[in-house]
């Protein structure tokens, strides 16, 4: 299977191992010569901690520092190089109870597409929180060619 310009959404409930799976998959594919962008789609913004070694600024933090003018957000402001050459972005989200984190996921793609950075990768992997009610977290499915669901045999994991 040829993986060029492929977008993959990884879903699962919190603590199930989706970020670990996403990071390991991203690094393994980067080691095989693929250009990888991993987008963390969780308000906790901890998806890309493993490849970068630190908590990277989110798209929300960066756009807030520019008075929410997305046209002033450049790829180099939000894309951070991690281990093995994996490029990483974190969507972030509003404070708890202050807005829709899922909306942020959709808005994360906008500046990346407008700057054409979205099209520079062989594989874009969305690491998405899957156990919340907010419908905005389905936004990566609008872009994804494939969806991976990380689960175990517990009822909660399957219903998330």
UniProtKB/Swiss-Prot annotation:
Compartments, as annotated in UniProt: Plastid, Chloroplast
Listed transmembrane segments: none
Class of the enzyme per the UniProt entry, highest EC level: oxidoreductase
Alphabetical keyword list: 4Fe-4S, ATP-binding, Chlorophyll biosynthesis, Chloroplast, Iron, Iron-sulfur, Magnesium, Metal-binding, Nucleotide-binding, Oxidoreductase, Photosynthesis, Plastid
Binding site for Mg(2+): 19
Residues binding ATP, per UniProt: 15-20, 44
Cofactor needs: [4Fe-4S] cluster
SUBUNIT field: Homodimer. Protochlorophyllide reductase is composed of three subunits; ChlL, ChlN and ChlB.
Sequence similarity: Belongs to the NifH/BchL/ChlL family.
UniProt-recorded name of the protein: Light-independent protochlorophyllide reductase iron-sulfur ATP-binding protein
Protein's gene: chlL
């Amino acid at each position: 299977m040829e993986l060029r310009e492929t977008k993959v959404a990884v879903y699962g409930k919190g603590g199930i191992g989706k970020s670990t799976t996403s990071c390991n998959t991203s690094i393994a594919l980067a080691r095989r010569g693929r250009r990888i962008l991993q987008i963390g789609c969780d308000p906790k913004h901890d998806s890309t901690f493993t490849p970068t070694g630190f908590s990277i600024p989110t798209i929300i933090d960066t756009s807030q520092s520019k008075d929410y003018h997305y046209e002033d957000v450049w790829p180099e402001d939000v894309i951070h190089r991690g281990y093995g050459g994996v490029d990483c972005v974190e969507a972030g989200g509003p404070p708890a109870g202050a807005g829709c984190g899922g909306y942020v996921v959709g808005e994360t793609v906008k500046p990346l597409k407008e700057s054409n950075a979205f099209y520079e990768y062989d594989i874009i992997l969305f690491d998405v929180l899957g156990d919340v009610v907010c419908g905005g977290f389905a936004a990566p499915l609008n872009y994804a060619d494939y969806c991976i669901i990380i689960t175990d045999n517990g009822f909660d994991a399957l219903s998330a």
